[in-house]
Structure formats: C-alpha cells, structure tokens
Regions:
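Short, mixed-charge, low-aromatic patches
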Residues: 1-4, 28-36, 68-76
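Long, basic/Gly/Ser/Thr-rich N-terminal segments
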Residues: 1-18
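Walker A/P-loop NTP-binding active-site region of P-loop NTPases
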Residues: 50-104
Length: 104
C-alpha cells in the first residue's frame, strides 16, 4: 500500500532538474482509491477524537521522507471538506513544506 501511495503522490517536476519531488493533494488527484483512503483515515481520526473528546491530532515520525507532510495536508483537507474547523501547523522549522503544498 505504501508503494502505491508513493507512485501516486510523488511525481517529478517537469520544469526543474533538481530532483525535487512535487506533492499532490487530494484536491489535485483523480484516483478515487487514494481520495477514499484519506477520507477513511479522516473518518477514523474523527471517530477516535469523538470517543476521547480530543481536539488535537499530531502526525510524527522519526525518519524523513515517510509522508508526514502530505498525509497531514490531505487529512486536513478531508476534515475541512466536512465543515470542521482545521488549523494545520507545520512545526518543521528546518525544512517546512506545507507552504509549498498549498502554494502560499
């Protein structure tokens, strides 16, 4: 499943030869299975939040390149699509990428 996500979500930039990876959000992907996977993850997180009366979700990992940024962006988009208030904070002070994902 992870290899499937890597193939769908990571594509080489056509303009730059730097080898950087462009990340696509669920707003840009036409693959139904990928979008539904993130919506299922959103539903599971929202259910767990309602059971424990939690308002904060943290995604973390000890290794770089495991998909924390794109997963948090896509889960945030999926939650916002339900009408929930979402505040996504990029706490990676050295290599922040959320502004690149959302093109701001």
């Amino acid at each position: 499943m992870i290899k499937f996500f890597n193939k769908v979500y990571r594509r080489r930039k056509k303009v730059s030869n730097t080898g950087k990876i462009e990340r696509a959000t669920i707003m840009e992907v036409d693959n139904f299975q990928v979008v539904e996977s993130y919506k299922q993850l959103r539903t599971n997180i929202m259910f767990a939040m309602s059971v424990k009366d939690t308002t904060i979700v943290e995604l973390s990992s000890s290794y770089p390149g495991e998909g924390k940024s794109i997963t948090s962006a896509n889960v945030s988009i999926a939650m916002a699509q339900t009408g929930a208030k979402v505040l996504l904070i990029d706490c990676d002070l050295r290599k922040s990428v959320q502004h690149k994902i959302f093109k701001v």
